[in-house]
């Protein structure tokens, strides 16, 4: 049987009628099945023929498909009983009750049926046009397709076929007739397998099977040796067969988000790979053969269960990105220092205590280093040279108790440092040399003092010092004129310096959970401030100048047990959207007004303000 023949395997043909129904013409006998009987030839040679004769003799009455009475074209309608009365028992048509097995299930709405029919018609028309016009690119994505018509075999000119985001559970065998196909997108369907006929698509370069229901890599894929790009992300694949080695032309392979426990030695045969993504699987080890993939520039291994990395990884001298986040590594091999093209090194979420001596210094192209959520107790060895070209360092959530003096002396491009959740008690004496720093996160440490030299960090835009042991902020903070976010939450601060008012670019000031008794009047100069949190302090009053904060949108002053009244000037904050005054003994404002939200409180303040005539 030639599945790719336009005439098909039988003599019947299908066409779309003007009413939207598919009309079938067949050279064989036909049988019409009705709800109340069987009419026409093709049945047994007994009663059916005689019944037809009897019906013809009875004014040629016919049985309609809707279950109504037989119709006499030349006279009145006859009931079934009347028909039976004029017919011998042996020639009477048998009563047939047709009941679908799922007839008890809720029936789809007419609207849904019409929509599906229309979708099917659109697909058929698209395939016909593709055949008639020799179209090379066909996009049937998001078309609610459940079954791809076998007439797809006629679209032999196709080089690109997009079927993503449908409801296809199985491809027709005729897909193999598309011998010119180069790009086939089947992502976001319900495929559990692929037909063997796909092997005839010998020119296929790109195959996208993301987000399907494949429990294994279909064996036919291994026969598509022209493939350069294969996406198998988010399926249910548990293993990779040794036949993978046949796909020697692959440059991109994605097996992300499956259930793969082992990557066999066959991976080493894919010497043309430039991108390999096996993240979010269950790998515990990598084969040594990974070192044969010398053209790899991106290797993503994050979110696995890797216990070690083979030394052969040092052979990947073209590697630019290596993702090792969230595994079970205790160390990395020193051979990584040979991967001198790497610009990002990320081992977040492992159990690493130290890196090999001088490894980072050897990776001179690094711009981003992420060592967060490990077991480091000190900075990596290698001195200032290891951060020469780095602009971002993340050591969050480790056990580091100090930043070595001069460690960033060569890091002229360092703009972002995250030391959150460590054990720092002080900053190094040369902190004033970090002049290019833009974002500095020192939250959740044990800092007791902020050095005056902080004034030199004049490019700083984000300074996070929350959850430390600071008692005061130096006056030199006013020199940080570019500061947009200042987070001092959960310290022991009692007084803010007057110079805080010089931070005209400040948008968020977080002072929650301190021991502040009053805000400086200069706070009114913070014209760009949108968020001010002073909750859980010891405020006795708010300065009148708070009314000058024309950009203020959120104000948290809750849980200040000594705050008994609000200044009338607060009503001047026209952009205020959220006001939290819970657990403040505001005796002057009625409870029902307080419960009404910020707009009602502001309205009350305005009505009772001496400025109400203004």
UniProtKB/Swiss-Prot annotation:
Any GO BP: positive regulation of Ras protein signal transduction
Record flagged with keyword Repeat: yes
Keywords from the named record: Leucine-rich repeat, Repeat
InterPro entries xrefs: Leu-rich_rpt, Leu-rich_rpt_typical-subtyp, LRR-SigEffector_domain, LRR_dom_sf, LRR_R13L4/SHOC2-like
Ranges where the record places region Disordered: 1-29, 44-79
Listed Pfam families: LRR_1, LRR_14, LRR_8
Repeat listed as a keyword: yes
LRR repeats (start-end): 134-155, 157-178, 180-201, 203-224, 226-247, 249-270, 272-293, 295-316, 318-340, 341-362, 365-386, 389-410, 413-434, 436-457, 459-480, 482-503, 505-526, 528-549, 551-573, 575-596
Any one cellular-component term (Gene Ontology): cytoplasm
SMART domains the UniProt entry points to: LRR_BAC (SM00364), LRR_SD22 (SM00365), LRR_TYP (SM00369)
PANTHER family tied to this protein: LEUCINE-RICH REPEAT PROTEIN SHOC-2, LEUCINE-RICH REPEAT-CONTAINING
Family to which this protein belongs: Belongs to the SHOC2 family.
General function of this protein: Acts as a Ras effector and participates in MAPK pathway activation. Probably acts as a regulatory subunit of protein phosphatase that specifically dephosphorylates Raf kinase and stimulate Raf activity at specialized signaling complexes upon Ras activation.
Name of the protein this chain belongs to: Leucine-rich repeat protein soc-2 homolog
Origin species: Drosophila virilis
Lineage of the organism: Eukaryota, Metazoa, Ecdysozoa, Arthropoda, Hexapoda
């Amino acid at each position: 049987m030639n599945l790719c023949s336009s005439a098909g395997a039988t003599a019947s043909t299908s066409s779309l009628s003007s009413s939207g129904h598919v009309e079938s013409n067949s050279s064989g006998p036909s049988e019409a099945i009705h709800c109340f009987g069987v009419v026409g030839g093709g049945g047994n040679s007994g009663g059916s023929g005689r019944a037809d004769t009897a019906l013809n003799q009875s004014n040629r009455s016919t049985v309609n498909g809707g279950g109504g009475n037989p119709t006499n074209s030349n006279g009145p309608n006859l009931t079934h009983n009347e028909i039976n009365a004029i017919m011998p028992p042996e020639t009477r048509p048998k009563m047939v009750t047709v009941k679908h097995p799922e007839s008890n299930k809720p029936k789809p709405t007419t609207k849904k049926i019409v929509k599906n029919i229309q979708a099917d018609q659109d697909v058929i028309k698209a395939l016909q046009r593709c055949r008639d016009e020799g179209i090379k690119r066909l996009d049937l994505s998001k078309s609610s397709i459940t079954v791809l018509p076998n007439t797809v075999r006629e679209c032999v000119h196709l080089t690109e076929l997009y079927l993503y985001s449908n409801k296809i559970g199985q491809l027709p065998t005729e897909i193999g007739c598309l011998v010119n196909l180069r790009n086939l997108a089947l992502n976001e369907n319900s495929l559990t397998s692929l037909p063997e006929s796909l092997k005839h698509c010998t020119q296929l370069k790109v195959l996208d099977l993301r987000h399907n229901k494949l429990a294994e890599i279909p064996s036919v894929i291994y026969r598509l040796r022209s493939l350069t790009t294969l996406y198998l992300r988010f399926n249910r694949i548990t293993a990779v067969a040794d036949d993978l080695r046949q796909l020697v032309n692959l440059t991109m392979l994605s097996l992300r988000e499956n259930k793969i426990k082992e990557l066999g030695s066959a991976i080493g045969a894919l010497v043309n790979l430039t991108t390999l993504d096996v993240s979010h699987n269950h790998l515990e080890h990598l084969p040594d053969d990974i070192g044969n993939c010398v053209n790899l520039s991106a290797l993503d291994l994050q979110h696995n269960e890797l216990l070690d990395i083979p030394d052969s990884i040092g052979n990947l001298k073209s590697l630019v990105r290596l993702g090792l986040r969230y595994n079970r590594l205790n160390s990395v091999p020193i051979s990584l220092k040979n991967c001198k093209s790497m610009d990002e090194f990320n081992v977040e979420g492992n159990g690493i205590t130290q890196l090999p001596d001088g490894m980072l210094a050897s990776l001179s192209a690094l711009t981003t280093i992420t060592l967060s959520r490990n077991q480091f107790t000190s900075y990596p060895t290698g001195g200032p040279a290891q951060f020469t070209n780095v602009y971002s360092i993340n050591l969050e959530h480790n056990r580091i108790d100090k930043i070595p003096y001069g460690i960033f002396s060569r890091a002229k491009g360092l703009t972002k440092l995250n030391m959150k959740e460590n054990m720092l008690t002080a900053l190094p004496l040369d902190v004033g040399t970090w002049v290019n720093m833009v974002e500095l996160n020192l939250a959740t440490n044990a800092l007791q003092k902020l050095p005056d030299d902080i004034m030199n960090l004049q490019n700083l835009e984000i300074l996070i010092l929350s959850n430390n042991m600071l008692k005061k902020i130096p006056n030199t903070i006013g020199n940080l004129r570019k500061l947009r976010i200042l987070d001092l939450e959960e310290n022991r601060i009692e007084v803010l310096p007057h110079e805080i008012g010089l931070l005209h670019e400040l948008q968020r000031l977080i002072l929650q959970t301190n021991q502040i008794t009053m805000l400086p009047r200069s706070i009114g100069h913070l014209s760009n401030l949108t968020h001010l949190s002073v909750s859980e302090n010891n405020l006795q009053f708010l300065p009148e100048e708070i009314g000058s904060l024309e950009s203020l949108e959120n104000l948290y002053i809750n849980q200040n047990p000594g705050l008994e009244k609000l200044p009338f000037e607060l009503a001047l904050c026209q952009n205020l959207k959220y006001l939290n005054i819970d657990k403040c003994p505001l005796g002057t404002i009625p409870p029902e007004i307080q419960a009404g939200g910020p707009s009602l409180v502001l309205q009350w303040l305005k009505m009772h303000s001496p400025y109400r005539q203004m």
